[in-house]
């Protein structure tokens, strides 16, 4: 319990400071989250959803926290240059876990659309935030969600009213910046009302060569006939620990797409919980992981079919080299009465070295009798025959290996809807395989 004790002691001693620098709406659920965290403790590897990542070890170091909300000396526009060519975006910044108001884009939003500091909106429009905040992210079941809820003081709030479609993709840059080892606790709340449509690109970067621990909780509500595309790209460094929990709720005839791409990291654990609340909905959940050295990437998903006539599609692909460790555990739950469910779940993995390790566990749990559900996983190495064939035609073995890995991972990238983003990722992935992309491509954040 040593890992938990430091956070329990921290909250006991500093809870008033935390509350003084946060909105009342966030504070209303804070004490309950603390009680839940104290009861749960960090999960051990005996807990099914956490058996591939040692959470006790990740949270054991003594990180600093900016509880007094001191302003971080950083100019995002001076340090960040990593845009996606030909993609018209509204650009926002979160520095550590604070919404950066000094860099708000000079873009007129559609009527009624809100993109702002979660803490500020919670103070100005508490009834709107209170309706959604903490309703999906269950602190009673997950210790990381409880810890984030008990410590988070700010983040991002996005609200898209009924039948409004955002003209531009919303790009959110999460920048980690500190002169000391630091823990940050980010919160994101996304609400798409009936008939709304929005596309998001979240990019994670580390500006300093320090040890960072970032917890993140995203709650996304997708109303009837609404359309959400959520893309998450991580390009940090080997000293970064990222623990992200994403919760998505879909209403009738809605569509959601969640794409997570890990190109550079230290230790990453991504959890996705998606629930169908209305019939006729569909989701597309894709993951792309490229890892080498001692990187560790763990993706854990739960797709909960609670109602009939819904469709879920999952495809996660990993390319692991050197001593990298990958894990994928995906559970599709089809509840009683959720007839006519269609579900496809696939995890394909390529180990490019003898020391790379991959753990995979796709699962189906079905309590309805009129469904079409399939799942599968593979772990393999590069095809020697294909390599030999390419060498015989004058292609260098290293180049042949790169081409095969690139072709393998492209299936995931091609499923993304934003063409400029697809083109950019093709470029980044190729440079990553060639060893030409050490950290963030196109910016000087990590130099």
Protein language model regions, located:
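N-terminal amphipathic, basic helical "cap/leader" segment at the start of enzyme domains
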Residues: 1-146, 315, 321
């Amino acid at each position: 319990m040593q890992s938990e004790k430091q956070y329990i002691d921290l909250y006991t001693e500093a809870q008033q400071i935390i509350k003084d620098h946060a909105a009342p709406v966030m504070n209303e659920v804070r004490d309950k989250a603390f009680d839940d965290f104290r009861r749960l403790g960090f999960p051990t590897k005996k807990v099914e959803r956490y058996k591939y990542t040692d959470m006790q070890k990740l949270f054991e170091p003594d990180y600093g926290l900016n509880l007094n909300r001191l302003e971080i000396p950083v100019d995002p526009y001076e340090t960040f240059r990593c845009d996606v060519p030909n993609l018209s975006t509204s650009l926002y910044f979160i520095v550590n876990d604070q919404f950066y108001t000094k860099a708000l884009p000079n873009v007129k939003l559609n009527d009624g659309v809100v993109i702002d500091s979660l803490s500020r909106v919670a103070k100005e429009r508490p009834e709107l935030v209170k309706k959604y905040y903490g309703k999906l992210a269950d602190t009673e079941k997950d210790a990381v969600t409880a810890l984030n809820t008990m410590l988070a003081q700010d983040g991002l709030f996005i609200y898209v009213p009924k039948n409004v479609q955002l003209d531009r993709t919303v790009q959110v840059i999460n920048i980690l910046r500190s002169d000391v080892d630091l823990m940050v606790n980010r919160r994101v709340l996304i609400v798409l009302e009936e008939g709304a449509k929005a596309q998001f690109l979240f990019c994670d970067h580390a500006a300093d060569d320090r040890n960072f621990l970032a917890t993140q909780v995203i709650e996304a509500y997708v109303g009837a006939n609404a359309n959400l595309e959520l893309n998450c790209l991580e390009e940090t460094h080997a000293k970064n620990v990222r623990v992200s929990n994403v919760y998505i709720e879909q209403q009738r005839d809605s569509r959601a797409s969640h794409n997570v791409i890990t190109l550079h990291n230290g230790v990453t654990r991504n959890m996705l919980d998606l629930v169908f609340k209305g019939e006729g909905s569909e989701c597309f959940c894709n993951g792309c992981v490229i890892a080498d050295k001692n990187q560790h990437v763990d993706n854990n998903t739960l797709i909960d079919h609670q109602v009939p006539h819904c469709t879920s599609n999952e495809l996660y692909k990993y390319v692991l080299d050197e001593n990298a460790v990958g894990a994928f555990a995906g559970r599709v739950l089809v509840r009683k009465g959720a007839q006519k469910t269609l579900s496809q779940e696939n995890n394909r993995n390529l180990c490019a070295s003898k020391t790379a390790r991959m753990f995979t566990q796709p699962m189906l749990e079905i309590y309805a009798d009129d469904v079409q559900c399939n799942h599968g996983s593979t772990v393999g190495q590069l095809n020697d025959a294909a390599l030999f064939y390419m060498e015989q035609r004058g292609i260098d073995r290293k180049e042949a290996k790169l081409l095969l890995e690139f072709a393998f991972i492209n299936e995931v990238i091609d499923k993304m809807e934003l063409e400029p983003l697809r083109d950019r990722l093709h470029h980044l992935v190729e440079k990553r395989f060639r060893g030409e992309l050490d950290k963030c491509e196109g910016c000087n954040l990590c130099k």
